[in-house]
Amino acid sequence: MDILSISWAFLMVVFTFSLSLVVWGRSGL
């Protein structure tokens, strides 16, 4: 595994996590 795929995987995880936080915040949970 090279650094590019590691950084891409990390970016996707952070993006998904922040997106779910926004959705949960707007849902009132």
Swiss-Prot record:
> What are the annotated GO cellular component locations?
chloroplast thylakoid membrane; cytochrome b6f complex
List where in the cell it is found.
Plastid, Chloroplast thylakoid membrane
Keyword field contains Chloroplast: yes
Keywords linked to the UniProt accession: Chloroplast, Electron transport, Membrane, Photosynthesis, Plastid, Thylakoid, Transmembrane, Transmembrane helix, Transport
The record's disulfide annotation reads none
Gene Ontology biological-process annotations? cytochrome complex assembly; photosynthesis
Q: Where are the transmembrane segments?
A: 3-23
The terms under GO molecular function for this entry are: electron transporter, transferring electrons within cytochrome b6/f complex of photosystem II activity
**What does the record say about its membrane topology?**
Single-pass membrane protein
User: SUPFAM superfamilies from the entry?
Assistant: PetN subunit of the cytochrome b6f complex
Record flagged with keyword Thylakoid: yes
Which HAMAP family does its entry note?
Cytb6_f_PetN
State the function annotated in the UniProt record.
Component of the cytochrome b6-f complex, which mediates electron transfer between photosystem II (PSII) and photosystem I (PSI), cyclic electron flow around PSI, and state transitions.
Protein family (similarity comment): Belongs to the PetN family.
Oligomeric state and interaction partners are given as: The 4 large subunits of the cytochrome b6-f complex are cytochrome b6, subunit IV (17 kDa polypeptide, PetD), cytochrome f and the Rieske protein, while the 4 small subunits are PetG, PetL, PetM and PetN. The complex functions as a dimer.
User: This protein is called what?
Assistant: Cytochrome b6-f complex subunit 8
State the species of origin: Chara vulgaris (Common stonewort)
Gene name, Swiss-Prot/TrEMBL: petN
